[in-house]
């Protein structure tokens, strides 16, 4: 899907449906006065490492050639020794083409060491292009799709094209959703172009920047240009020129100001970002309860006026959406549809010009959700967004965008952004029902309960449980009603971070096959709130126990069916919020006990721009 955000805002739209993909990588570039570009670029990449951490690389001009340092693995405590330079860029990779090796890390150079390229995306026709280039005598060093770009540009530059024109022509030959930045050591400029994969140009004084995320720019400037699809940016120390990809005609520069605080990017004394971000969840819920009245009233009014509301998410966000469907039904007596972003296209025929499509996304860049929103707009529906990253694609394309306000979430796993979504949806449902004060009250109780759980040794209690089950191969989790999605999210969190096979189920489905999986000693997690689901949940837990399950109850009140009880506060309809924390901690401690990094699980990246 190719998106023209300006066109969407102005009421017209051009959409091209394509079977393309973009990968998740972090990009940062600088052009300006001579500086220690190596440490500058590497520092920015550390802030972007959540986008990919298979390998990394930086490059700078060193006289008449490109100096490069790159290696496989996480950045960690790495340092670089690149020379002082007026131009440099870097890349942190999430591998899709070619193994995780030093050679396959970006940047990639032409054969003369004059040009360098970094790339985010997947070039669908790279084999065809590679064969063509090999036939013309080009030598390839890597197994990546990216390297075809630098060789194509090399041929055009040697034939007399400017760097901008060579980049335009090359990008036009690439099939897929891609973003590239090109450096030519004979020119003091970077050239950038993209489709879907985000690129933001930072406008400084005597220097300009480009990055895949605003968080990497705000240390240097808050004046930015969000590069739109099929725009080419020529970035020089004293100017930025925008060109149309197809015609090469100049385009107006739409300068915007980053007027929000990015938040604390440091560990703040915590051993890792996951533990820090779990500890911040009470603050996040309290912030929604006390400061989001206008936001939720606007969202409640929009839902009230809509005929057909779709909550659209992927992964953790999809479970927040599913919880939302229960909240609106239970509290506001309003039917809303929870739909996976990747499955939305199969239900789009229900959309009308009175529908509301509400996107839930931490990054605001999730490709499947962007596609769903573009489809919704094409059918005349209103677009809403709950996003954590201000200035992201979904934030800018929405008619109504509500910031999650969770602050930077640098652990690849989503914790506090998930909780923020639940809090906003809970308060919106109560506002729609005319019981906003009740909603605020239960959120404040939930915020206090989250803080109290940690302050009163909850993490240590969960660690003791993790020590007891650390060698288990399987973990099964049940919930009902509001806490059925909680069971699904708990299973996802545990398997993402600890690599223990975990599955969540609706408790009523036990008799329909799930119970066949249980063996003696299998750990089973049970969410048993003090609501109308409790009796049935405990009955299901007894069935599991009778088949040998080790029952771990997350509940405000002990029950004899529990072999282990993890007490939580009774906060009514906010129970999914307080129940999430023990499950997050269980995954965290299992990961630590098994020797895994909770911030950077294998094969995962946070900003999922892959379709």
Q: Which residues does each predicted region cover?
A:
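Glycine-rich phosphate-binding loops that contact phosphosugars or nucleotide phosphates
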Residues: 301-445, 480, 527-573, 586
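Active-site phosphate/pyrophosphate-binding segments
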Residues: 274, 280-310, 379, 400-523, ...
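Short helix-capping/linker segments at secondary-structure and domain boundaries
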Residues: 34-37, 155-162, 188-189, 430-439, ...
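Glycine-rich oxoanion-binding loops at beta->alpha junctions
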Residues: 91-103, 286-300, 324-360, 366, ...
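Internal helix-turn-beta structural module
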Residues: 570-592, 596-598
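Acidic/histidine-rich
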Residues: 177-207, 470-496, 531-533, 538
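Conserved short alpha-helical segments that host acidic/polar catalytic motifs at enzyme active sites
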Residues: 13-267, 271, 280, 286-290, ...
């Amino acid at each position: 899907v190719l998106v023209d955000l300006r066109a969407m805002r102005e009421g017209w739209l051009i959409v091209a449906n394509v079977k393309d993909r973009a990968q998740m990588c972090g990009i940062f570039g600088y052009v300006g006065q001579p500086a220690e570009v190596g440490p500058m670029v590497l520092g920015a990449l550390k802030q972007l490492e959540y986008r990919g951490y298979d390998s990394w690389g930086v490059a700078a001009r060193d006289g008449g050639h490109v100096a490069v340092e790159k290696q496989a693995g996480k950045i960690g405590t790495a340092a670089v020794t690149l020379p002082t330079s007026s131009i440099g860029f870097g890349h942190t990779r999430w591998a899709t083409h070619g193994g995780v090796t030093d050679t396959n890390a970006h940047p990639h150079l032409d054969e003369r060491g004059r040009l360098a390229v970094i790339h985010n995306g997947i070039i669908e026709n790279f084999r065809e292009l590679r064969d063509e280039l090999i036939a013309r005598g080009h030598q390839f060093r890597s197994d990546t799709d990216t390297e075809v770009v630098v060789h194509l540009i090399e041929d055009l530059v040697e034939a007399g094209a400017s760097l901008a024109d060579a980049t335009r022509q090359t990008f036009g030959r690439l099939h897929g959703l891609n973003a590239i930045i090109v450096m030519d050591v004979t020119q003091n400029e970077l050239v950038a172009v993209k489709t879907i994969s985000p690129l933001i140009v930072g406008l400084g004084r005597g220097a300009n920047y480009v990055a895949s995320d605003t968080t990497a720019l705000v240390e240097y400037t808050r004046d930015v240009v969000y590069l739109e699809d099929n725009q080419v940016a020529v970035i020089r120390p004293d100017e930025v020129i925008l060109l149309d990809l197809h015609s090469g005609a100049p385009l107006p520069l739409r300068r915007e100001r980053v007027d929000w605080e990015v938040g604390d990017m440091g560990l703040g004394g915590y051993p890792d970002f996951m533990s820090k971000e779990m500890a911040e969840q009470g603050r996040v819920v309290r912030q929604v309860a006390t400061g989001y009245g206008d936001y939720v009233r606007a969202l409640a009014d929009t839902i009230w006026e809509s005929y057909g509301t779709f909550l659209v998410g992927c992964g953790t966000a999809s479970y927040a959406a599913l919880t939302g469907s229960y909240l609106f039904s239970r509290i506001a007596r309003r039917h809303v549809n929870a739909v996976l972003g990747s499955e939305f296209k199969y239900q789009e025929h229900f959309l009308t010009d009175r529908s509301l499509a509400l996107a839930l996304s931490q990054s605001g860049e999730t490709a499947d959700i962007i596609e769903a929103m573009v489809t919704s707009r094409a059918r005349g529906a209103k677009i809403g967004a709950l996003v954590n990253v201000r200035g992201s694609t979904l934030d800018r394309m929405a008619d109504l965008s509500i910031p999650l306000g969770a602050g930077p979430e640098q652990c690849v796993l989503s914790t506090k952004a998930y909780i923020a979504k639940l809090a906003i949806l809970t308060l919106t449902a109560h506002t729609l029902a005319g019981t906003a004060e009740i909603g605020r009250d239960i959120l404040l109780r939930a915020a206090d309960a989250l803080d109290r759980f940690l302050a009163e040794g909850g993490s240590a209690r969960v660690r003791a449980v993790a020590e007891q089950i650390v060698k288990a191969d399987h973990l099964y989790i049940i919930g009902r009603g509001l806490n059925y999605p909680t069971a699904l999210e708990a299973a996802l969190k545990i398997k993402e971070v600890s690599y223990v096979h975990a599955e969540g189920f609706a408790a009523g489905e036990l008799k329909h096959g799930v119970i066949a999986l249980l063996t003696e000693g299998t750990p089973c997690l049970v969410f048993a709130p003090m609501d109308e689901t409790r009796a049935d949940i405990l009955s299901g837990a007894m069935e599991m126990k009778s088949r040998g399950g080790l029952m771990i109850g997350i509940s405000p009140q002990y029950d004899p069916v529990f072999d282990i009880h993890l007490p939580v506060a009774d906060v009514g309809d906010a129970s999914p919020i307080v129940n999430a924390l023990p499950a997050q901690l269980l995954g965290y401690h299992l990961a630590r006990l098994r020797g895994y990094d909770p911030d950077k699980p294998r094969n995962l990246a946070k900003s999922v721009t892959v379709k």
